[in-house]
């Protein structure tokens, strides 16, 4: 309205007609202004009347009512903030409800005031203001997450080996596991401040701590501090945790102690963290199971508000490097799909096509940047963990070096250093004289105590007592083992080494207790006996674990045997299946082998391919050998040649059979049974002939091979003659030889120089015996020339004689049985005849000399 009035003032002129018109306009404007003012005054009056009426109904003054209404939005904001922070709804109701009640002067005035003041527009405006403030606060809180993580890492020296991005990832993991981001990040920060290390386990630890703290109401810092003690000393830390929270057992502590004593610090820390985490999870579960209906409803309400506020806080929280990479990949994929869809579209102009390409390139560059960021973050996480491990190791060895230095200091050096320290403090006025005197006296007393020689133990255990105690302890140990074996006689029952150690310790303590009743114990024995209960308790725990380990090893061994047996059966079934399909045994065996190899190397495809390739090469070589008939011939001949040239074994066997035959025939002759010297002699001669023929055949084949080789080399004639001579020598042709089979007019055999061959008719006419007598002394080939007399022939046959035995047996037996004298006579005669025959056949031309074949 002011603007028209201003225009009116400016437009006034001295024209009367126009002046009247302008005055009319002024009146209309002022009348409108008056009406507007009256309306405004009426609204204000009505508002004041309503406020006065509401204040009157509430029983308070208008000023008190206005002050209470001004404070109401701020109190609503406090209620929303406290609910989001995880406080109990009942506690918030008591706090904020009491403040609202006090603002209105009581419960009834409060409800009357709220009923009169809360209108729909006011509720909307208030809700909008509260929502805006909450969003602004949430954005600020979420945006400061990384800053808070960095502060925590810096102030803790980053002993956990984490980065802010890694802490953000772990908090997101807790949020995905059902916790809120704030709960997980709070417990994670507390663990980092407590010095908890072990990046692989800190995720599960932080979630367990958050759940336990939420369910029990115990402060997160106290639980995190308990985990921090595990990092310093797993055994003592776990013991302290058991005393404070009662969530781990003595068996778990003993197992951790065993690992730590064996030098496995990392394994001990991991086992301690796992035991503590499991213990807190069990306690959390029991707490929730034992909640009443009201507590359960309150817990669900609180978790609902926490989840709602946590979702609001996500607005300002930064993304992790991995989340940024995922979003960048999605954005690039979307831009690339749009470009591929629009680049060849006829209805898209060049400007739009260029814009689509620019969007794709921007998305690609953003993706590359996100990938580099993710790689850098991964490397930073590794470097942080490595730096943490290095720093922890340095700190550990620094502490050990300091302790070692203190141990290496002599008492005098320690006393001198303490004196200098106290004197300097007194000189600088940093210590009171009375305190100086007390500390100096204590240092002097400690030094003087080190100068006193410790008294030697006056009790000495004799060698006999020690030997007796040792034998007694061994006896008790074996008795305990025997009792256990009698109780557990199953095939799968095994006794662990830890159980045997327990028996040994129990036996030693039993012997010490018995010895204490009959003699005085040494200081060492008293010390052992004083720690009996603790030692045996640890031994029992170790024995129980050792039995479990032994039993599990047995189960594992049986499982491996079962797997091996199953593999064998599958291979057999594969062979059976192959035979059922009509394959040969060799093919079935190959399929079974393939099945065994697949079962054995199935987990490693590369190794399976290698062994299958080598096996197939072997099968190919076997198939090639099976088709090579020449190789079979050579192999058969080589084996037969080895057997034929093994003269020692053959002659040994022949000699054994010969002497056995002589003994059997002699026994048969002496006992009156039927004996067959002819068959025996024939079998002996057959064996000897077979041996000689085998050797001759080997020689012939070898000579023929040499002859063929010589012929190929150009010396066929000479080599052929050499081969024939060698063959003749093998068949003893130097002594006359065999002319071979065939007709009368067919060429056969070989005749030496100076020899001749009898025809078949002449041989029959002269007689074989006479011919042999003619050949005695002439290498069985006969002498070609003027024949000599029979006497000459006999004289030339040296060492040859014929014997005719006339035996007359006078049997002096009774009842038709041969008598002793007759038996002896027959035995002597047979013995003499056998000796003479053997001597004859061993001469030139005899059967044993190679002649007479």
Curated annotation (Swiss-Prot):
GO biological-process terms attached to the record: symbiont genome ejection through host cell envelope, long flexible tail mechanism; viral tail assembly
The record's account of how the chain is modified after translation: Cleaved into mature protein H* by an unidentified protease.
Any matching Pfam family: Tape_meas_lam_C
Keyword Repeat found: no
Listed Low complexity bias regions: 376-387
Alphabetical UniProt keywords: Coiled coil, Viral genome ejection through host cell envelope, Viral long flexible tail ejection system, Viral penetration into host cytoplasm, Viral release from host cell, Viral tail assembly, Viral tail protein, Virion, Virus entry into host cell
Coiled coil (residue ranges): 360-387, 548-568
Region (Disordered): 370-393
An example Gene Ontology CC term for this record: virus tail
InterPro entries: GpH_LAMBDA, Phage_tape_meas_C, Phage_tape_measure_N
Domain of life, source organism: Viruses
NCBIfam families tied to this protein: tape_meas_lam_C
Biological role: Serves as a ruler that controls the length of tail by stopping the tail tube polymerization and is probably released from the tail shaft during infection to facilitate DNA translocation into the host cell. Assembles into a multimeric linear form possibly stabilized by the covering tail assembly proteins G and GT. Its C-terminus fixes the tail tip complex (J, I, L, K), thereby forming the tail assembly initiator complex. Tail tube proteins polymerize around tape measure protein, displacing the tail assembly protein G and GT.
Quaternary assembly: Interacts with the tail initiator complex presumably through its C-terminus domain. Interacts with the tail assembly protein G. Interacts with the tail assembly protein GT.
Family to which the UniProt record says this protein belongs: Belongs to the Lambdavirus tape measure protein family.
Name by which UniProt lists this protein: Tape measure protein
Gene: H
């Amino acid at each position: 309205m002011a603007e028209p009035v201003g225009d009116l003032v400016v437009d006034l002129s001295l024209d009367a007609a126009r002046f009247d018109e302008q005055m009319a306009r002024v009146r209309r404007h002022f009348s409108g202004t008056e009406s507007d003012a009256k309306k405004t005054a009426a609204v204000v009056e009505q508002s004041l009347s309503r406020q006065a009426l509401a204040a009157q109904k509430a029983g308070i003054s208008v000023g008190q009512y206005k002050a209470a209404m001004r404070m109401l939005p701020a109190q609503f904001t406090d209620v929303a903030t406290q609910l989001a922070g995880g406080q109990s709804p009942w506690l918030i109701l008591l706090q904020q409800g009491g403040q609202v009640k006090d603002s209105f002067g009581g419960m009834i005035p409060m409800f009357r005031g709220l009923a009169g003041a809360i209108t729909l527009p006011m509720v909307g405006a208030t809700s909008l203001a509260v929502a805006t403030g909450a969003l602004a606060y949430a954005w600020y809180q979420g945006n400061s997450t990384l800053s808070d993580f960095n502060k925590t890492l810096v102030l803790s020296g980053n002993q956990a080996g984490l980065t802010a991005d890694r802490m953000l990832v772990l908090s997101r993991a807790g949020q995905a596991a059902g916790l809120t981001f704030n709960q997980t990040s709070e417990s994670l920060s507390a663990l980092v401040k407590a010095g908890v290390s072990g990046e692989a386990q800190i995720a599960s630890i932080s979630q367990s701590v958050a759940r336990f703290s939420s369910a029990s109401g115990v402060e997160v810092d106290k639980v995190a501090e308990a985990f921090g003690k595990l990092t310093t000393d797993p055994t003592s830390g776990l013991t302290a945790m058991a005393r404070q929270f009662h969530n781990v057992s003595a068996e778990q502590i003993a197992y951790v102690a065993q690992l730590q004593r064996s030098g496995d610090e990392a394994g001990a820390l991991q086992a301690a963290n796992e035991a503590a985490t499991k213990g807190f999870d069990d306690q959390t579960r029991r707490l929730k199971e034992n909640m009443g209906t009201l507590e359960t409803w309150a817990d669900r309400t609180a978790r609902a508000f926490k989840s709602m506020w946590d979702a609001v806080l996500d607005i300002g929280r930064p993304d992790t490097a991995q989340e940024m990479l995922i979003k960048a990949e999605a954005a690039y994929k979307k831009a690339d799909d749009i470009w591929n869809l629009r680049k060849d579209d006829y209805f898209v102009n060049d400007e739009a096509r260029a814009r689509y390409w620019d969007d794709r390139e921007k998305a690609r560059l953003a993706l590359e940047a996100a990938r580099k960021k993710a790689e850098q973050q991964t490397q930073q996480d590794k470097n942080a963990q490595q730096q943490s491990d290095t720093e922890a190791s340095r700190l550990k060895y620094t502490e050990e070096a300091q302790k070692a230095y203190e141990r290496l200091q002599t008492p005098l050096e320690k006393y001198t250093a303490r004196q200098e320290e106290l004197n300097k403090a007194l000189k600088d006025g940093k210590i009171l004289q009375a305190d100086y005197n007390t500390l100096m006296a204590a240092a002097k007393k400690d030094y003087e105590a080190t100068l006193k020689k410790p008294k030697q133990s006056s009790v000495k255990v004799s060698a006999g007592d020690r030997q007796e105690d040792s034998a007694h302890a061994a006896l008790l140990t074996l008795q305990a083992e025997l009792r256990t074996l009698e109780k557990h006689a199953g095939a799968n029952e095994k006794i662990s080494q830890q159980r045997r150690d327990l028996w040994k310790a129990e036996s030693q303590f039993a012997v010490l207790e018995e010895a204490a009743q009959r003699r005085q114990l040494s200081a060492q024995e008293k010390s052992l006996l004083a720690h009996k209960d603790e030692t045996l308790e640890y031994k029992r725990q170790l024995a129980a674990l050792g039995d479990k380990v032994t039993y599990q090893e047995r189960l594992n061994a049986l499982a491996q045997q079962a797997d091996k047996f199953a593999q064998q059966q599958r291979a057999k079934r594969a062979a059976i299946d192959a035979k059922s399909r009509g394959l040969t045994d060799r093919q079935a065996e190959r399929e079974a082998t393939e099945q065994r190899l697949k079962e054995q190397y199935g987990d490693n495809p590369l190794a399976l391919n290698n062994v299958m390739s080598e096996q197939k090469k072997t099968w190919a070589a076997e198939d090639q050998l099976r088709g090579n008939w020449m190789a079979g011939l050579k192999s058969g001949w080589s084996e037969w040649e080895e057997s034929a040239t093994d003269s020692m074994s053959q002659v040994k066997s022949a000699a054994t059979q010969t002497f056995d035959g002589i003994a059997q025939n002699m026994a048969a002759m002496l006992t009156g049974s039927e004996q067959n010297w002819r068959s025996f002699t024939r079998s002996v001669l057959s064996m000897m002939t077979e041996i000689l023929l085998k050797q001759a055949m080997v020689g012939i084949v070898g000579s023929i091979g040499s002859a063929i080789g010589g012929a190929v080399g150009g010396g066929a004639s000479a080599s052929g003659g050499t081969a024939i001579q060698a063959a003749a020598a093998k068949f003893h042709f130097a002594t006359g030889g065999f002319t071979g089979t065939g007709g009368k007019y067919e060429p056969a055999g070989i005749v030496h120089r100076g020899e001749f061959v009898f025809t078949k008719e002449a041989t029959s006419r002269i007689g074989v015996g006479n011919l042999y007598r003619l050949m005695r002394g002439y290498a069985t080939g006969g002498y070609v020339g003027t024949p000599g007399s029979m006497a000459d022939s006999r004289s030339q046959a040296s060492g040859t004689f014929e014997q005719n035995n006339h035996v007359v047996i006078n049997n002096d037996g009774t009842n038709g049985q041969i008598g002793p004298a007759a038996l002896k006579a027959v035995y002597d005669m047979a013995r003499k005849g056998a000796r003479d025959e053997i001597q004859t056949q061993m001469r030139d031309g005899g059967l044993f000399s190679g002649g007479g074949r």
